[in-house]
């Protein structure tokens, strides 16, 4: 096992215009303060205020958006980070682990990773993801790229169908088809930060949001040693070279994770479980009393000193006494949140310290709050009650289905851009208006400038005389469409769909 030295992980250099020379503790902290400014002032963070947490298109400001959720995760992440550092200090481990002058960056990386953790999510959350992936699957049929004979390939894009005698190109075709059918919010977050917004964050800060280590073009089973870390796609083919450099800069082995990402993940798990239950009461999906009975019944028999008794029952009893002269709902969720944090944060911090050799190596194949403990059971309780009584509610399901239809519909509306030949689309990009393509010209104008520039830059770097050029060009054209639609807010996507379907002006 390699020696634990966080100076080898908390890399304050950047991809472009990186600070040079040896830096003092204060100078390194200023570099991470610059990261904070870049992140907090970015449009991607602002757009989170109109993206779904659980309830799409919600007008009640008391119900969480992705932004308010991310701010709560940021605070919990800060709490866990401080708890870890405090315990390490008591154990006199800070200097031994190279953290004595890096406590500020340690906290900052965790906080900003938490704030950014959802920036790649499309409109309507997981249903938006499903809509994008289903739409591309119906056209690319990536599963057929594994089959023989080649005549069975149902891919609708002629250039991406497998061809006899072109094995090197066929392998690229397989990768592209698989990659485009595995849109994922975490992978899109990496693409946003590096490629689309060019935030030029420190290597350590980007490492904090690389939650999953599986490439989106992965086919087949994942290694048993990394099955948890690779359970979802973490980055796209378009960012393959950048992630390879990131691994080198952060001393990460293949498919391994950056250590501080486990803290961000735990903060998210703690935050959303309580928040989803609270938002459902705010939405009157169930009453507070009904929620308590749902939790009580799902936990089952318990002793007086059990975790359920100390956390949930304690919050229920205190809220019933109304000692603070506030609404019962407000008091219950205040106590539930405090009780939950007071139990789960120290537990997560200790799990991090106890498993530090594997976490530092990036190979710890679990979440911090995923084990056989009562703390893990408490989180499962919150999640199971939310799945059974919140996500399955008719109002929630109706809005999710509408969101799926909106994203599918927008992809269909913009499909003509993907139907153009390479030469025709190149002409459209260069001239921006081509008389013989009136529909395509107008659709192209609607694409945002940063997304169009990202496409142009990616294609301009390709050798145009290579046989791979048409494949890569089409790949980046599909990415252009996914980037544009996934970057919309819920409300903008909803309004845009209605306008383009001529439902309203």
Swiss-Prot record:
<comment type="similarity">
    <text>Belongs to the dGTPase family. Type 1 subfamily.</text>
</comment>
<feature type="domain" description="HD">
    <location>
        <begin position="66"/>
        <end position="273"/>
    </location>
</feature>
<dbReference type="InterPro" id="IPR006261">
    <property type="entry name" value="dGTPase"/>
</dbReference>
<comment type="function">
    <text>dGTPase preferentially hydrolyzes dGTP over the other canonical NTPs.</text>
</comment>
<dbReference type="InterPro" id="IPR023293">
    <property type="entry name" value="dGTP_triP_hydro_central_sf"/>
</dbReference>
<keyword id="KW-0378">Hydrolase</keyword>
<comment type="subunit">
    <text>Homotetramer.</text>
</comment>
<dbReference type="Pfam" id="PF01966">
    <property type="entry name" value="HD"/>
</dbReference>
<dbReference type="InterPro" id="IPR006674">
    <property type="entry name" value="HD_domain"/>
</dbReference>
<dbReference type="InterPro" id="IPR020779">
    <property type="entry name" value="dNTPase_1"/>
</dbReference>
<dbReference type="InterPro" id="IPR003607">
    <property type="entry name" value="HD/PDEase_dom"/>
</dbReference>
<protein>
    <recommendedName>
        <fullName>Deoxyguanosinetriphosphate triphosphohydrolase</fullName>
        <ecNumber>3.1.5.1</ecNumber>
    </recommendedName>
</protein>
<keyword id="KW-0460">Magnesium</keyword>
<dbReference type="GO" id="GO:0006203">
    <property type="term" value="P:dGTP catabolic process"/>
</dbReference>
<dbReference type="GO" id="GO:0008832">
    <property type="term" value="F:dGTPase activity"/>
</dbReference>
<dbReference type="InterPro" id="IPR050135">
    <property type="entry name" value="dGTPase-like"/>
</dbReference>
<dbReference type="GO" id="GO:0000287">
    <property type="term" value="F:magnesium ion binding"/>
</dbReference>
């Amino acid at each position: 096992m390699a020696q634990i030295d966080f100076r080898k992980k908390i890399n304050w250099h950047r991809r472009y215009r990186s600070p040079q020379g040896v830096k003092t503790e204060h100078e390194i902290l200023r570099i991470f303060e610059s990261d904070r400014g870049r992140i907090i002032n970015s449009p991607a963070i602002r757009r989170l205020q109109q993206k779904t947490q659980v309830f799409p298109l919600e007008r009640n400001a008391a119900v969480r958006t992705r932004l308010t959720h991310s701010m709560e995760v940021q605070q919990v992440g800060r709490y866990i980070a401080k708890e870890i550092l405090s315990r390490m200090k008591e154990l006199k481990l800070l200097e031994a682990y190279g953290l004595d002058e890096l406590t500020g960056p340690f906290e900052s990386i965790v906080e900003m990773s938490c704030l950014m953790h959802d920036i790649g999510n499309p409109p309507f959350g997981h249903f938006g993801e499903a809509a994008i992936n289903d739409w591309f699957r119906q056209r690319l049929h990536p599963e057929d790229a594994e089959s023989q004979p080649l005549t069975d390939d149902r891919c609708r894009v002629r250039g991406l169908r497998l061809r006899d005698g072109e094995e090197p190109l066929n392998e690229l075709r397989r990768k592209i088809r698989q990659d485009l059918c595995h849109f994922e919010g975490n992978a899109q977050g990496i693409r946003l930060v590096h490629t689309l917004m060019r935030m030029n964050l420190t290597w350590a800060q980007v490492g904090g949001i690389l939650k999953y280590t599986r490439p989106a073009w992965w086919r087949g089973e994942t290694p048993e040693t990394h099955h948890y870390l690779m359970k979802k796609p973490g980055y796209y083919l378009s960012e393959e070279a950048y992630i390879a450099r990131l691994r080198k800069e952060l001393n990460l082995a293949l498919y391994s994770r950056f250590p501080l990402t486990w803290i961000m993940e735990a903060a998210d798990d703690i935050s959303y479980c309580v928040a989803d239950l609270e938002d459902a009461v705010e939405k009157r999906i169930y009453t507070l009393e009904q929620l308590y009975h749902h939790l009580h019944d799902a936990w089952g028999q318990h002793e007086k000193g059990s975790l359920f008794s100390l956390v949930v029952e304690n919050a229920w009893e205190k809220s019933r006494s109304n000692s603070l002269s506030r609404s019962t709902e407000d008091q219950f969720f205040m106590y539930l949140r405090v009780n939950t944090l007071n139990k789960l944060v120290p537990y997560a911090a200790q799990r991090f310290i106890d498993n530090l050799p594997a976490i530092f190596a990036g190979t710890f194949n679990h979440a911090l709050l995923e084990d056989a403990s009562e703390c893990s059971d408490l989180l499962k309780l919150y999640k199971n009650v939310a799945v059974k009584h919140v996500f399955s509610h008719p109002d929630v399901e109706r809005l999710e289905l509408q969101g799926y239809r909106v994203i599918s519909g927008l992809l269909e509306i913009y499909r003509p851009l993907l139907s153009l030949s390479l030469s025709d689309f190149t002409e459209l990009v260069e001239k921006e208006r081509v008389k013989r393509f009136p529909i395509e010209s107008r659709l192209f104008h609607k694409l945002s400038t940063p997304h169009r520039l990202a496409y142009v830059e990616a294609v301009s770097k390709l050798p145009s005389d290579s046989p791979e050029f048409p494949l890569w060009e089409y790949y980046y054209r599909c990415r252009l469409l996914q980037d544009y639609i996934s970057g919309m807010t819920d409300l903008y996507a909803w309004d845009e769909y209605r306008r383009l379907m001529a439902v309203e002006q």
